[in-house]
Design a protein with these regions (language model features):
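Phosphate/oxyanion-binding active-site loops and adjacent basic polyanion-contact surfaces
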Residues: 14-15, 81-87, 113-118, 458-467, ...
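Active-site metal-binding core of divalent-cation-utilizing nuclease and nuclease-like domains
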Residues: 36-98, 304-332, 353-357, 480-534
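Nuclease catalytic cores
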Residues: 3-23, 440-504
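Non-catalytic C-terminal interaction segments of nucleic acid-processing enzymes
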Residues: 112, 161-458, 516-517, 582-671
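Low-complexity, serine/threonine/proline-enriched polar segments
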Residues: 3, 24-70, 162-204
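Transmembrane beta-strand segments that form the barrel wall of outer-membrane beta-barrel proteins
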Residues: 105-110
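Catalytic cores of nucleic-acid endonucleases
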Residues: 111-160, 374-375, 383-388, 520-523, ...
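Compact beta-rich and alpha/beta scaffold cores in large eukaryotic transport/transcription complexes
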Residues: 9-13, 21-47, 138-144, 196, ...
């Protein structure tokens, strides 16, 4: 009986990336080639048989889209001791009769890891390692920032302290946090040369392979990844302005401590890098005074002078408590002041805007406190979170009534409450005279002897399933003259559009704009018909007809045409090559694109009547309506008002009958 595994992915693309990583790792360690074959399953949870020439065989089943199944993965992680209910891009389990056994978690970052987005994912690493699940973070380096004309401006990089945090975490949780840095597909030759010593080799593949071959994971497997991660941080630090960050000598001390799992607060406190954080949003008059107070105390910067956190030596906390009492008066509790005075630990202060002008959560900020905890994973420090953004008044009421209840229903507050020792509020929306501090009492970690129940194959149907059907049908179809240029299901990162030119080379446009003027709308899918009839088909997918935008079809056409015709491609891969370069023959590419018609389609969950209405409502050239039945079968309805496109798609779908049968998809085209 073949062993069965499941990949619970953020979407179907992440599931496919995970299966590629797993099979590549096993091939590397065994030297055995393999095949991956779609087997009889259903469209919402497609299954694949993986067969290696050495006799190893197993089945991998995809479960795309988190938090829509009969079992809650975040709740399970909480029971295992995770302070956060954060999911990852791909969570791999071993399927038993009634349960699933967690094996590994994969995170894929191929968007530009800079600015506040660089720490958005920090909570995921903390969530997995706290639950004792091996976590592998794959990050592409050297992605290009584009100017307003979509020409390459410069590569973007994170603050060195962000990748440093993963290195620190890897020492605090041996064998549980591994970072793999790889060159971006749009990396320049110069940038590649700068960072080539930091790019991963194949050692980490031994650790991934061991999860599926029954071997022990040796620390030796991951040792080199730690060395590479350290090199990447050092290379980043070397590129930064000297006045903005620590000296290279200090960075080397920090890296040595992180690799050995030793505390690092002492290095930061003795480095004398002054913290100079600036607040960019409208704030209370007291907030600049708080920042000025911290500067007078000569608190130490972490990573660079402008990061939103600093560290304070324990010897300065009594003075800090005294000055905070003067600044905030009776709105600061005696309990908070006494705690601050009497604690014998160094203090990390994290500044969190947390909220947009209208009071909605700012998603990237949920990673700030996890990032601080990861940096100091080998230190025993206290953390105060200063929340200064314009949260709604009801939020403050809930925070002071029951912070744990608030955290149970909100990811931002979950990170703040569960990973801070205290919270200080200095926001314009806090009622005058309201107490502004919360002390977080230590909660016993809920490490339970629990198992993950087997997931049902039938989810709460939605846009994920529409996107999965389109992707399963159109992907891997080059032999039939069809190329999937873009698939961006929910949770996707819009990392790029690919296009096959007349020479068979793949040209890629990255860092996609959300719109191209008021006339353009970024599609969810782009399909290239490159055979006799040359068409670029842009598709908008939605769950329901009512959520479909009026007149979106022409806007899809405009976006894709504007991008491919007038926008510069950033990278190119020759036919049958694995290497990407920036050497693009613009003349060949422009000529190839000019030969195509640009058409549009929409895809929704629905019946024949809704298919017809979606075609009219969207003003597009074709529509797909998809019905999901409780028994797992799928009905796919296709309609088009464009004779050429209708014939092309029907002919193509007829070549996919075997695939449709395996996925239990019933096709019906209507006039």
């Amino acid at each position: 009986v073949k062993q069965k595994y499941r990949i619970h992915g953020d979407n179907i693309i992440e599931c496919e990336v995970a299966i590629g990583i797993i099979t590549d790792a096993i091939k590397f360690t065994t030297g055995s080639d393999y095949s991956v074959k779609l087997i009889e399953s259903i469209s919402v949870t497609p299954a694949y048989e993986v067969s290696f020439e050495n006799g190893l065989e197993f089945i991998l089943e995809f479960f795309p889209g988190h938090n829509r199944w009969n079992v809650s993965l975040p709740d399970f992680l909480t029971q295992l001791g995770s302070p956060l209910r954060e999911s990852v891009d791909a969570f791999v389990t071993l399927l038993n009769e009634d349960t699933e056994v967690p094996l590994a978690a994969f995170e894929f970052c191929n968007a530009l890891p800079a600015g506040n987005n660089a720490w958005q994912r920090a909570g995921r690493a903390l969530s997995m390692t706290s639950a004792n699940i091996p976590y592998f973070y794959f990050a592409e380096i050297g992605g290009q920032e584009l100017d307003a004309n979509r020409e390459i401006k410069a590569p973007r990089f994170p603050n060195p302290i962000v990748p440093f945090s993963y290195l620190s975490m890897s020492s605090a949780t041996p064998d549980k946090c591994t970072t793999i840095y790889m060159p971006s597909r749009s990396i320049s030759k110069d940038t590649y040369e700068e960072f080539k010593d930091a790019f991963a080799d194949n050692d980490y593949k031994n650790a991934i392979s061991a999860l599926f071959t029954g071997n022990e994971i040796s620390e030796e497997f991951l040792k080199n990844s730690k060395i590479k991660s350290s090199q990447f941080v050092y290379d980043l630090a070397e590129k930064r302005k000297r006045s903005n960050t620590h000296s290279l000598e200090t960075w080397q001390k920090l890296l040595n401590s992180a690799k050995l799992g030793k505390p690092l607060a002492g290095h930061l406190l003795s480095d004398n890098l002054k913290w100079t954080k600036k607040i960019s949003i409208e704030s209370n008059p007291s907030l600049p005074k708080l920042i000025a107070l911290l500067k007078l105390l000569e608190v130490s910067a972490i990573g660079s002078v402008d990061m939103p956190f600093c560290v304070i030596d324990t010897s300065k906390k009594a003075k800090l408590a005294e000055e905070l009492s003067k600044l905030y008066g009776e709105t600061l509790s005696n309990e908070f002041v006494d705690w601050l005075k009497n604690s014998d630990k160094d203090l990390v202060v994290v500044f969190i805007a947390g909220f947009k002008p209208r009071g909605d959560d700012s998603r990237p900020d949920r990673g700030l406190v996890p990032l601080a905890r990861m940096i100091f994973a080998n230190d025993d420090v206290n953390v105060i979170s200063v929340v200064y953004g314009p949260a709604k008044a009801i939020t403050w009421s809930r925070l002071f009534e029951d912070p744990y209840m608030l955290s149970a229903n909100n990811g931002l507050w979950e990170a703040i409450v569960n990973l801070s020792n205290a919270i200080l509020v200095d926001s314009k929306t806090l009622p005058v005279g309201q107490r502004r501090d919360v002390l977080i009492k230590a909660q016993a970690s809920k490490v339970e002897d629990t198992s993950l129940a087997r997931f049902s194959n039938i989810p709460r149907f939605g846009e994920h399933d529409v996107d999965s059907v389109l992707h399963l049908i159109f992907s891997n179809s080059e032999d039939n003259g069809v190329f999937e240029s873009l698939c961006n299901p929910p949770g996707g990162d819009w990392s790029g559009v690919s296009f096959l030119d007349s020479e068979g080379s793949t040209n890629r446009w990255t860092s996609l704009p959300r719109v191209t003027g008021i006339e353009g709308k970024r599609p969810d899918h782009i399909i290239q018909y490159f055979d006799t009839n040359r068409v670029v088909l842009s598709i908008e997918s939605k769950d329901l007809l009512r959520n479909l935008e009026e007149g979106v079809g022409p806007r899809l056409d405009h976006y894709t045409k504007e991008l491919l015709v007038n926008g510069m491609a950033q990278s190119k891969k020759l036919k049958d090559s694995l290497e990407w370069s920036q050497e693009i023959n613009l003349e060949v590419l422009k000529q190839a694109v000019s030969e195509y018609d640009f058409l549009s389609a929409v895809a929704i969950m629905g019946n024949e009547a809704e298919a017809r209405e979606s075609l009219s409502k969207s003003q597009s050239n074709a529509a797909f309506a998809i019905s999901f039945v409780e028994d797992g079968s799928t009905e796919l309805i296709f309609i088009s008002n464009h004779p050429k496109l209708r014939e092309m798609i029907i002919n193509f779908l007829n070549t996919q009958q075997n695939k449709l049968k395996l996925l239990n998809i019933n096709l019906r085209s209507i006039n």
